[in-house]
């Protein structure tokens, strides 16, 4: 097991007090949701393939279940990516700055991104409520379609919280952090372009 996998398994937030507890709890919840989502999607897809080729019948609900799982994995995954500093960043100007400038810029970036995530959460809640009002249902599974989109505002909320925590971590630390647990820097395996 690599150091990165070991750190992932025993994640502990670098934030103080209740913020660290919340961050660690959200991290564990995200890991469970993502692992279960991927396993369920794989199981569902394999069962459908076996059913189609061995029995000549596809499972009627496979497409809808995989659609639900894709939405769940995507929006649980954005918070996970932010937590582990796995997001896309444009670093030409950022890398040219001294440590203090990088930390200040990371605080601004984190706060702005957090606000954008909360803004998107606000509008996605309205979208889910609109779907609820329309009363649409999934044809194969027969339950209301708004339920599968509840993951969208939850994902934006968790990601917004994570970026807010990153800003707090940078405000309370001497180092520059990409997330609450990832210090800025390049590993030996990464190359600068």
Curated annotation (Swiss-Prot):
Organism: Halomonas elongata (strain ATCC 33173 / DSM 2581 / NBRC 15536 / NCIMB 2198 / 1H9)
Family as reported in the entry's similarity comment: Belongs to the TRAP transporter small permease family.
Keywords per UniProt: Cell inner membrane, Cell membrane, Membrane, Transmembrane, Transmembrane helix, Transport
Its membrane topology: Multi-pass membrane protein
Transmembrane segments annotated in the record for this chain: 33-55, 65-82, 103-125, 145-167
Gene expressing this chain: teaB
GO cellular component, as recorded: plasma membrane
Disruption phenotype: Deletion abolishes accumulation of ectoine from the medium.
Listed name of the protein: Ectoine TRAP transporter small permease protein TeaB
Lineage of source species: Bacteria, Pseudomonadati, Pseudomonadota, Gammaproteobacteria, Oceanospirillales
Localization terms from the record: Cell inner membrane
Subunit structure: The complex comprises the extracytoplasmic solute receptor protein TeaA, and the two transmembrane proteins TeaB and TeaC.
PANTHER family tied to this protein: 2,3-DIKETO-L-GULONATE TRAP TRANSPORTER SMALL PERMEASE PROTEIN YIAM
Job description of the protein: Part of the tripartite ATP-independent periplasmic (TRAP) transport system TeaABC involved in the uptake of ectoine and hydroxyectoine in response to osmotic upshock. Probably functions as a recovery system for synthesized ectoine that leaks out of the cell.
